[in-house]
Design a protein with these regions (language model features):
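Residue-level detector of the short coil/turn that links helix A to helix B
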Residues: 6, 46, 87-88, 133, ...
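Amphipathic alpha-helical segments of tetratricopeptide repeats
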Residues: 19-20, 59-63, 98-108, 146-153, ...
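Residue register of alpha-helical TPR repeats
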Residues: 33, 72-75, 113-120, 159-163, ...
Length: 299
């Protein structure tokens, strides 16, 4: 057993004893806090059923209480929302809406969350909501995350700002706000390029996605040249990652070369298309010889 697991197991034993005692003669506040803490420990240990039981018991207990600490309130709904995501989307949405109802009370560190923890909570909830097409509901979380990082310029914060701008772009696209999405992706690219150029970017694929998604919007708006530029910028990064053996899956690299070649051929840009087709061949993509033959017939 890892040392971290041993620590969690010891903490679990202590909370089992504490909750047993509090159920006899503790206050509701004390019992609620202990249940939320044990739920978190169980979740970290992978005991999701038991963790869910504690989270649900905490939520039911809180409903009869006049005042619930903001940190404890957020934590119990976040815990259950995270665990229920795959099985009960509506309950997850309901739990996250409860968090939204108290986001305005958060201006800095609270119980269960330091500053970084709050930002990660907001980012995680936004990601979950976007994944199930609840785009509008993600907005309070991304806004709160950016508000908390308003004056931050450290490397960690700049990486989070880039990622959150990508989430905003996805949500705006989902809501049909393409111009807003372009602004969000452009901000992500501005931050991401600065991080990438100074080797401080944590996940270069986030920058790739910003270029790809902005390019996709440009293509939908018939700004083909701008799409080509964005997708080729994404390819520069992917090729560099591939050359350094840091690209675990070349699928996106291959697809971008193929799609650019196809788009350029349709526009009569044969020489530019050939470059991408030849690269696709070098990457071992089947069927590219036929595409080359078709391109040559168009000369």
């Amino acid at each position: 057993m890892r040392a971290s697991d041993e620590h969690l197991e010891q903490a679990l034993k202590e909370y089992n004893d504490k909750i047993s005692a509090l159920e006899v003669n503790g206050t509701d506040d004390e019992l609620l806090e202990a249940l939320v803490n044990r739920s978190t420990i169980l979740m970290l240990l992978g005991s999701y059923t038991a963790s869910m039981t504690d989270a649900e018991e905490a939520i039911e207990l809180s409903k009869g209480m006049k005042d619930v600490d903001i940190g404890t309130f957020v934590k119990m709904y976040e815990n259950r929302g995270q665990m229920i995501f795959d099985d009960n989307e509506e309950m997850m949405v309901s739990d996250y809406s409860m968090i939204i109802s108290r986001l305005d009370e958060i201006h800095g560190e609270i119980r269960h969350y330091d500053w970084k923890g709050l930002i990660m909570m907001c980012q995680g909830c936004a990601e979950d909501l976007i994944d199930c097409d609840r785009f509008e509901m993600s907005v309070p979380f991304t806004q709160k995350a950016l508000e908390l990082m308003k004056d931050a310029s450290d490397i960690w914060s700049m990486n989070r700002k880039m990622e959150i701008q990508n989430l905003i772009g996805q949500a705006d696209t989902g809501m049909g706000l393409d111009n807003n999405a372009i602004d969000a992706y452009s901000e992500s690219i501005l931050i991401g390029e600065q991080l990438y150029d100074t080797s401080r970017i944590e996940d270069p694929i986030q920058l790739v996605f910003a270029y790809v998604y902005r390019g996709d919007i440009m293509e939908a708006e018939h700004e083909v040249e701008k799409m080509w530029n964005d997708h080729e910028s994404a390819l520069v990064i992917l090729e560099e990652l591939n050359n350094r053996n840091r690209l675990s899956d070349p699928d996106l690299l291959i697809k971008l070369h193929q799609s650019l070649a196809s788009s350029m051929m349709e526009s009569g840009e044969i020489e530019r298309a050939e470059k991408h087709l030849m690269r696709a061949i070098n990457l071992g993509v089947p069927g590219m010889k036929d595409a080359i033959d078709e391109m040559n017939s168009m000369r």
